Amino acid sequence: MDRRAWLIGSGLCVLGRAAFGAPSAQSLAMMAREGGVLLIRHTSTEPGVGDPPGFTLGQCSSQRNLSEAGRAEAIGIGAWFSQHGLQPRAVLSSQWCRCQDTARLAFGRYEDWPALNSTFSTQDQQAPQLQMLRRRLRQLPSGALEVWVTHQVIMTGLTGAYPAMGEGFLVDAGGTLRARGLMRSGS
């Protein structure tokens, strides 16, 4: 197994500690060859569900934002990636401030992608957004790893599984959930 496969495998073993168990050597080698996307639900927020009435994208003061713990968790995700020598090809984020902040604190960079936006209050938008996500997954170059920072409703809609705040789901080009878990520095 080459260094890249080993590093991705290290990360997947940490991710795989949750319900799925540690992935096999074959699945690790396949993900290293074929690539995939690490979906990350934004890290911990101030208490609440959804956003306050009348919130506005681009106006963080009108939204539910990361808590101090959530900011530390995001920094920890970035440290975990650095510790394992992993560099995603792209970091894409929902336009919600809590997702942008998670991406910025973890990776120092991100691009907004409206397909990752929450559909909590606009469920009629979920099907077209999930189609866009699946299309990009299918077009992912072999061996490429991307990070998408998003919301529970998007991750559940794509995979059928429910993520905790800050949890990562590794999905392959077909949208199949391969591993899941929390990434913390030191692990």
Feature-to-residue mapping (PLM):
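Generic beta-sheet signal
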Residues: 35-38, 142-150
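Active-site-proximal alpha-helix that buttresses catalytic centers in soluble enzyme cores
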Residues: 23-123, 131, 161-187
